Amino acid sequence: MLAIGITGSYASGKTFILDYLAEKGYKTFCADRCIKELYQDLSVQTQILKLLPELESFNIGKISNLIYNNDLAREKLQNFIYPLLIDKLILFKKENANSKFGFAEIPLLYEAKFDKYFDFVVTIYCSEEIRMQRAITRTSFDIEIYNKIKEIQLSQESKIAKADFAINSGVDMLDLEKQIEKLILVIARKL
């Protein structure tokens, strides 16, 4: 299986494109959904509370607030959760070894050095204005966290420069589908 990593800035359209690929029958993996599942595990919750005692109780909102305002807390959580995420990603790749392609959405792919797990990387991008419009429609939107995420992540330009392919999600659906079709043609040549 050719492993394709999908990355991009916050609200750039990564999940939309991943879901589109899943609808087309491709195997997909979403890091954010995987982490949400891990957070449901009581043993994971217990470990996080031990690592971050300032939380007092397990609450996703409090975790977000803490890790985006405290570099040490973010590093502790990442050092704990990333190995679990890598295990799930490796399992996804093993379970889908007979598929031609597997797409995995990893928001912090470069920042977390996950690019080494992929044969090909795609960056999804759009204008800052469009990203902000998308972000404010989310129920969990918080402008302070949005700005902290922007500080932590590599710039869109850096992600595009590092990627093997880039998709502009700030276009109409027809143009977006054409870009995805081109991506499939490009990666099919790698087989």
UniProtKB/Swiss-Prot annotation:
PROSITE patterns: DPCK (PS51219)
Pathway: Cofactor biosynthesis; coenzyme A biosynthesis; CoA from (R)-pantothenate: step 5/5
One annotated GO biological process: coenzyme A biosynthetic process
Keyword ATP-binding attached: yes
A single cellular component GO annotation: cytoplasm
Gene Ontology MF terms in the entry: ATP binding; dephospho-CoA kinase activity
Sites where the protein binds ATP: 11-16
InterPro entries: Depp_CoAkinase, P-loop_NTPase
Pfam families from the UniProt entry: CoaE
Domain DPCK: 3-191
Catalytic function, reaction form: 3'-dephospho-CoA + ATP = ADP + CoA + H(+)
Subcellular location(s) per record: Cytoplasm
Keywords for the protein's UniProt record, in alphabetical order: ATP-binding, Coenzyme A biosynthesis, Cytoplasm, Kinase, Nucleotide-binding, Transferase
HAMAP family, sorted: Dephospho_CoA_kinase
The protein, known as: Dephospho-CoA kinase
